[in-house]
Amino acid sequence: MRIGTMIGADGANNTLDDIINVAKRAEAAGLDNVWLANIFGFDAISTLAIVGRETDRIGLGTAVTPTYPRHPTAIAQQALTTAAASKNRFTLGIGLSHQVVIENMLGMSYDKPAKHMREYLEVLMPLTRGETVNYDGDQYSVHGLALDVPGADRMPVVVAALGPVMLKIAGELADGTNTWMVGPNTMAKHIVPGLGRSDATVVGGVPIVLTTNIDQARETIGKNLVMYGQLPSYRAMLDREGVEGPQDIAIIGDENTLRGEIKRFEDAGVTDFNAAIMDVEEGAYDRTLEFLSSMK
């Protein structure tokens, strides 16, 4: 199992230079990859193109970029450019986002999200392979389009798929799934089998911190990540795991605890562990990164 970390999502390291420096630290620590969320700050795909020019080895991925505001041909072109810029270390992670964002904030329709993702991938995936697309769907229509991005190989594409229909689509059309707030039991019994294939990429992202102040860390994480317990898709995963909130999914404790919990994700079928380090107290980020480095 590859071990990576989330960058640019802790609220402190939020300038472009900070994100680059954190990625460099992760690379120096020997981690396999870094993952960047696309929320309301820097564009994740563009940022990782820059990170790719400033690093040498570490894998780069979006976790994730929303599909609705971006035509699949546009995101394919942008992603292939980032693949070329990073010498093909880039993994494109895409997702639907959430109904409250797409409808209430962006004023777009969130009708038939699974159909949207199927059509999106049916346009996107051939473009990443250098093929010419001729496609007529209900939401997208593309004719005679091919992309030529020198230096860009076909990149892995993972979908933020949690429900059974989306998992089936991700397994059928993409390379796997990129998850967040999914516990090891749900991963083993629902996510991995739901993809329907043995060679799928399964990214498991969870909060993590190395600390002896367990109760304080749980309380802080619960407060800081409270919204993830309220969004329907994540709430469903927490309920499947039988836990109350994000603080119960988080991996918190000493080195033995962290090592054992990470092993549970590996045993569940996760191929890429995405450690979202929670800087809940002074020195927590550095300690946790050093611990993750020791596992390599």
Regions found by a protein language model. Give the residues of each.
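Active-site-adjacent structural elements that line small-molecule/cofactor binding pockets in enzymes
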Residues: 1-296
